[in-house]
Regions:
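Conserved small-residue
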Residues: 1-64, 69, 73-75, 79-81, ...
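Short active-site loop/helix that positions an aromatic residue
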Residues: 602-604, 615-630
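Short, conserved aromatic-histidine micro-motifs
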Residues: 628-648
């Protein structure tokens, strides 16, 4: 347990639930076909492993125990990927040491004709299974009894959903089930019709963006869902949404899944002292590379770009929280950034006493007086995802109280922000780095590797047994109290493994640098000028090319980065925190504040709903970024919007399939990496692939 600001975060609250793949819902006939299919595949896999063993023995120069790896003292160059295959290698060596000769092993290999026959049987059995699943589309699916076992239990973190369902932290809970999809036919059946387990009916609930990427979804016991449905949806039913013309189904599922985010209960969330206002949006003039998605033509042009500066960001008074954090409530998500908007209003009143600057209009046209109503939190329209389905903010507040809805928080700024690591994507776009520059960038990592063998403090740091670690486990506590344990054989062996791991990470581009991950926050002073002083294009406190970072107050130039980093997303900006007392007064958190006159959000492709930036102060990286990105401008292209549909089981299934089959982020980013590895990379191809990658992300996260 740890305390951050006004909240206590208990990371140990977890709940055990069942997880089943689609095979766990098969009928007896389908199961028989599946077992036959697995047996055939096992023959193929066993043959592949046997061939690998024979090749390994031949490389050793013979067969039998005397040729096994354990009988030679020859020193070989370590394989940098060996730790990833350690278990497989040990198992293979064990089989190789049984004394069988190469000829004996060859005698067990499948012939070409046998392989052909088995592969033919695999195709036929697979087609028969698919046909049987299609024939059974209209049946009620049941979880097979043998699947309800300890092998199919996972743990999930505490969330609004688990709290509403009053889930146990000690027993296995049967109210939620996570389903892993292998055959779409079975998934279609249970998404549309539900399924039964132990006599109880379960219905499809939703899937988070992360679950969609891994082809998973959550089902819920129907009787339990009916009890908590209004608390989870703040009284907004599918019937009401359909009466308003429907919704983008994937957005709906993503927003419904917000209650399943790992959060800590915000017990005294002041719903009565919260309002929702229109976002702060302006046109920002600048040069962009415009991409036409239909023709892939790229045109550099000067234009006005519409930017929603507060996209996903709201404000909370310092009296309620000293730290920025992310909020979760029914249909509400985003960042709450600390900002004294009450003080802003008072100072505006002093400058112009004839105007009541405390008046602000919400998204429904209702005027509010910040002081008279004691407003402590200002949300923005972009944070209130289903705002159009409520007639007023008062209706949402009333239903919030009526149905016992709750809010949660997550990802609060820590008291101490650890240094971050560079990654290969950020490194590969600095295409002209010299060997000397690379050596400087690797210096911290190399120093750590050297000191791990001799410096006690470095050893403790690597183990996480330092004051900077918030939650020490028993092993770390032991090391902290008695560092002499570092000489223990177990510790020394673990240290060697850690050293190897750090070396492998460094080879893959994960390098220690002077940098930290910070919340991205817009110029909230400019937002208040817009909301309370009614300025269309407020000046704010930051000019184009400027940022504010209290964390790096002494560093006047920063490289602002964000993942995924695919196309030279190095935004080198001037940090003006130290030179401007007004900025120190208003931007008093550990986030990084960006200007409302800057196209930085288009360069880094971020919004402000809790996105973080890797803010780097390394002078070598900054110099290389300035050199490599001198002619880089933001990519700009229209994002397609899916239409609204009625919420039905059919629509839910179609939405899930569209997300599952909508593209593979990894394939695109890997293709981009291959392009950057060329001596003369095709930069235009990278730009187009980045656009396609963002289209895929948009489909996945709705």
């Amino acid at each position: 347990m740890m305390t951050l600001g006004v909240f206590t975060i208990n990371l140990e609250i977890q709940h055990s639930v069942y997880t089943f793949d689609t095979a766990c819902f098969y009928t007896d006939e389908e199961t028989e076909l599946d077992h036959r299919l697995q047996a055939l595949r096992k023959q193929i896999n066993d043959d592949k492993h046997l061939r690998s063993e024979i090749i390994a023995l031949e490389k050793k120069g013979g067969g039998g125990a005397e040729a096994s790896p354990s009988s030679t003292n020859q020193k070989t160059t370590p394989d940098p990927r060996a730790h990833l295959r350690g278990k497989q290698k040990r198992a293979r060596r064990k089989r190789m040491d049984t004394g069988d000769s190469i000829d004996e092993k060859r005698s067990h290999l499948l012939t070409a004709q046998e392989l052909k026959e088995i592969n033919k049987s695999i195709r036929e059995t697979k087609n028969a299974l698919k046909k049987k699943i299609d024939e059974n589309m209209g049946i009620d699916r049941h979880v097979r009894q043998e699947a309800i076992s300890p092998y199919n239990i996972i743990s999930i973190f505490d969330s609004n959903l688990t709290r509403c369902l009053k889930m146990s932290t000690t027993d296995v809970n049967d109210t939620l089930v996570v389903v892993k999809v292998y055959y779409f036919g079975v998934a279609e059946n249970i998404i549309k019709r539900g399924f039964y387990m132990n006599g109880e009916h379960y219905v499809f609930f939703s899937a988070s963006a992360g679950q969609i990427r891994t082809k998973k979804f959550v089902a819920i016991k129907e009787s339990a869902y009916l009890e908590v449905m209004d608390a989870l949806t703040c009284g907004l039913s599918a019937e009401t949404i359909n009466a308003h013309g429907g919704v983008n189904i994937n957005k709906y599922l993503a927003y419904l899944a917000l209650c399943n985010s790992a959060t800590t209960l915000w017990a005294k969330f002041p719903i009565e002292k919260t309002i929702v206002v229109d976002d702060f949006e302006t046109m920002v003039h600048g040069t962009v590379d415009h991409i036409d998605p239909s023709t892939y033509t790229i045109t550099r042009q000067e234009t006005d770009v519409p930017i929603t500066h507060t996209d996903g960001c709201g404000m909370i008074l310092p009296s309620l929280s000293k730290k920025n954090f992310m909020l979760r409530a029914p249909w509400v998500k985003g960042l709450l950034a600390v900002f004294p908007f009450d003080q802003f209003i008072r100072e505006a009143d002093q400058r112009d006493p004839l105007v009541n600057h405390a008046l602000i209009t919400d998204i429904y046209g209702q005027q509010h007086d910040v002081f008279k109503e004691g407003i402590q939190i200002i949300l923005t329209k972009s944070q209130f995802k289903m705002w159009k389905y409520y007639s007023s903010w008062s209706e949402y507040q009333r239903k919030f109280r009526q149905y016992g809805c709750t809010a949660g928080k997550c990802n609060e700024e820590p008291e101490r922000i650890d240094n971050a690591k560079f990654n290969y994507q950020m490194l590969q776009t600095l295409t002209d780095l010299t060997d000397e520059e690379l050596s400087k960038i690797c210096e911290k990592t190399n120093r750590k590797l050297r000191d791990m063998a001799s410096d006690r403090q470095t050893m403790l740091q690597v183990f996480g047994a330092t004051k900077k670690t918030y939650r020490l486990n028993a092993f770390q506590k032991s090391l902290a109290y008695y560092p002499e344990l570092l000489q223990d054989p177990y510790c020394r062996a673990t240290l060697r493994d850690l050293k190897n791991s750090i070396e492998l990470q460094a080879v893959a581009g994960r390098l220690d640098i002077d940098g930290k991950y910070l919340f991205l926050i817009p110029d909230l002073y400019a937002a208040c000028q817009h909301w309370f002083c009614h300025e269309e294009t407020p000046r704010g406190l930051l000019k184009n090319g400027e940022v504010s970072s209290r964390t790096f107050a002494k560093h006047h130039k920063l490289d602002v980065l964000r993942s995924p980093h695919l196309y030279k997303e190095h935004a080198v900006r001037r940090n003006v925190y130290e030179e401007n007392p007004e900025i120190q007064k208003w931007f008093a958190t550990d986030g990084i504040y960006t200007s409302s006159f800057d196209l930085i959000s288009k360069i880094l492709q971020f919004d402000n709903d809790g996105d973080k930036s890797l803010v780097c102060t390394d002078p070598t990286i900054i110099a290389a970024a300035e050199r490599n990105c001198a002619d880089v401008v933001p990519l700009y292209y229209p994002m397609a919007k899916a239409g609204a549909v009625r919420i039905t089981p059919e629509a839910k299934y179609n939405g899930m399939v569209a997300a599952w089959t909508g593209g593979n982020i990894g394939e695109i980013s890997n293709a981009i990496t291959k392009i950057w590895s060329n001596p003369e990379p095709d930069v235009d191809a990278v730009k187009i692939l980045v656009m396609e990658n963002n289209f895929v992300i948009d489909r996945l996260v709705a």
